[in-house]
Swiss-Prot record:
The keyword Mitochondrion applies. Keywords: Chaperone, Mitochondrion, Phosphoprotein, Transit peptide. Part of the mitochondrial complex I assembly/MCIA complex that comprises at least the core subunits TMEM126B, NDUFAF1, ECSIT and ACAD9 and complement subunits such as COA1 and TMEM186. Interacts with ECSIT. Interacts with ACAD9. At early stages of complex I assembly, it is found in intermediate subcomplexes that contain different subunits including NDUFB6, NDUFA6, NDUFA9, NDUFS3, NDUFS7, ND1, ND2 and ND3. Interacts with TMEM70 and TMEM242. Residues 53-63 have a biased composition (Basic and acidic residues). This is Complex I intermediate-associated protein 30, mitochondrial. It holds the Pfam family CIA30. It comes from Pan troglodytes (Chimpanzee). It is found in: Mitochondrion; Mitochondrion matrix. Its main location: mitochondrion. Belongs to the CIA30 family. Residues 42-63 are annotated as: Disordered. As part of the MCIA complex, involved in the assembly of the mitochondrial complex I.
Length: 327
């Protein structure tokens, strides 16, 4: 009977399903999930708040204090308006779509075409606050049973991103894995209105430009192509970045023509040029088999046009290696 009484009054569902964000997020988006979560917060009842007072003997020489307990009455239920939440979510995406259409007619990424054609450099990612860190994600071999750990936080004075952790090449004791030891930092895929996948267009630039400070370890810089084919999800273009250690910043310039093609971590004999007009993400991977702590501090990541670099592709192609290019 007590369970039936709770079901009729609605308190059972409010207690068991206090945070519906995990269930509603895939269907209604982030904004609706945050809105519905805020509705489940307990609200203080000023007319029914209980108080506790000290006795007169304990109040000698002290000021009288009153402690209010925020207790939500079982009769009061949060007013959940799903129609309003769905309407607000739809209006947000439509406003976002309107801005995208206006920017498209104005020019690439909302800039006039003549300014884009004359643009020689552009900062794509910089780290000046927590919202910049939210555009990235970190991962390690801990997901497959390894012992490596990696963390990402803001650097000193909130002017850089600090990637740090501990690398361990000890293989997981699962009876299958024989190698381990990697940590990575990957940018999130940009999203447009209605959670559509977006991409970066770097076709007018020829060099990747970074300002970093490390501990002397070599890193792998990985760039992924935007694709809808499941077979290409493990394909990427990579090159090495060597940090020299010490307290000073270093500027790293890597031409896009140097990036080599790999699939599932293996360099392929058949090499392809990096498609700069549809870049989905960039990442940094550490896997040098040197166990111990590490760190990499990043100021910004950008692209620019180097007039002195005229190379289009650094790797040889021949009819034996890549017969499709010579048909």
């Amino acid at each position: 009977m007590a369970l039936v009484h709770k079901l009729l009054r609605g308190t059972y569902f409010l207690r068991k399903f206090x945070k519906p964000t995990s269930a509603l997020y895939p269907f209604l988006g982030i904004r609706f999930a945050e809105y519905s979560s805020s509705l489940q917060k307990p609200v203080a009842s000023p007319g029914k708040a209980s108080s506790q007072r000290k006795t007169e003997g304990d109040l000698q020489g002290d000021h009288q204090k009153e402690v209010a307990l925020d207790i939500t009455s079982s009769e009061e239920k949060p007013d959940v308006s799903f129609d309003k939440a769905i309407r607000d979510e739809a209006m947000y995406h439509f406003r976002h779509l309107k801005d995208e259409i206006v920017d498209h007619w104005r020019g690439p990424e909302g800039h006039p075409l003549h300014e884009v054609l004359l643009e020689q450099a552009k900062v794509v990612w910089q780290f000046r606050g927590k919202e910049d860190l939210d555009k990235w994600t970190v991962t390690s071999d801990k997901t497959i049973g390894g012992r490596s750990e990696v963390f990402l936080k803001m650097g000193k004075n909130n002017q850089s991103a600090l990637l740090y952790g501990t690398l361990s090449s000890e293989a997981p004791q699962d009876g299958e894995s024989t190698r381990s030891g990697y940590c990575a930092m990957i940018s999130r895929i940009p999203r447009g209105a209605f959670e559509r996948k977006m991409s970066y267009d770097w076709s007018q630039f020829n060099t990747l430009y970074l300002r970093v400070r490390g501990d002397g370890r070599p890193w792998m810089v990985n760039i992924k192509e935007d694709t809808d084919f499941f077979q290409r999800t493990n394909q990427m273009y990579s090159y090495f970045m060597f940090t020299r250690g010490g307290p000073y910043w270093q500027e790293v310039k890597i031409p896009f023509s140097k990036f080599f093609f790999s699939n599932r971590g293996r360099i392929r004999d058949v090499q392809h040029e990096l498609p700069l007009d549809k870049i989905s993400s960039i990442g940094f991977t550490l896997a040098d088999k040197v166990d111990g702590p590490f760190f990499l501090e990043i100021d910004f990541i950008g692209v620019f046009t180097d007039p002195a670099h005229t190379e289009e592709f650094a790797y040889e192609n021949s009819p034996e290696l890549n017969p499709r290019l010579f048909k």
